[in-house]
């Protein structure tokens, strides 16, 4: 007999970010500044997953992610899902998609880039190379970088 038990406590209302690759959960907490809120946040790390082997999960009470946040999530956790919960019931499920452009979040690795000026915010567009790998191209210096270099 298999017993199904939640490994991270259920929330009454809010967002659940599920299927985050293991070790990425803390990065998302700081990226979206979830730790700067008074909202209750529950995080599970290195949980067993049929889909990923191991996963992280984040539950944020009384908070619903913006479309921009959901799409930025795809950069770090392309297989993630965002579940909206109301009265302990699932009312919506979203599968993030990679945005065309991302502003202010990332830092250009090129030390000579104009985006390092205090009056300019960084801006990247996403491209794919011949191997279908995701790259980021800085809008200011126009240099292209592998995803793992910028993230």
Swiss-Prot record:
Q: Which InterPro entries match?
A: Asp_carbamoyltransf_reg_N (IPR020545), Asp_carbamoylTrfase_reg (IPR002801), Asp_carbamoyltrfase_reg_C (IPR020542), Asp_carbatrfase_reg_C_sf (IPR036792), Asp_carbatrfase_reg_N_sf (IPR036793)
Q: Which parts of the sequence bind Zn(2+)?
A: 108, 113, 138, 141
Keyword field: Metal-binding, Pyrimidine biosynthesis, Zinc
Q: Name one GO molecular function term.
A: metal ion binding
Homology family: Belongs to the PyrI family.
Known function: Involved in allosteric regulation of aspartate carbamoyltransferase.
**Name of the molecule in the record:** Aspartate carbamoyltransferase regulatory chain
> Where is the organism placed in the taxonomic lineage, from the top?
Bacteria, Pseudomonadati, Pseudomonadota, Gammaproteobacteria, Enterobacterales
């Amino acid at each position: 007999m298999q017993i199904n038990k939640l490994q991270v406590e259920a929330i009454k209302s809010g967002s659940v970010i599920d299927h985050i690759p293991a070790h990425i959960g803390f990065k998302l907490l700081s990226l979206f500044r979830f730790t700067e809120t008074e909202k209750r946040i529950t995080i599970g790390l290195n949980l067993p997953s049929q889909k990923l082997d191991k996963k992280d999960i984040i539950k944020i009470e009384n908070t619903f992610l913006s479309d921009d946040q959901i799409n930025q999530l795809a950069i770090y956790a392309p297989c993630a899902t965002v579940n909206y919960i109301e009265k302990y019931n699932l009312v919506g499920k979203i599968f993030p998609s990679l945005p065309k452009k991302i502003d202010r979040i990332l830092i250009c690795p090129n030390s000579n880039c104009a985006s390092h000026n205090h009056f300019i915010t960084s801006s990247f567009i996403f491209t794919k190379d011949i191997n279908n790998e995701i790259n980021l191209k800085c809008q200011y210096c126009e240099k292209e970088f592998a995803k793992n270099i910028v993230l």
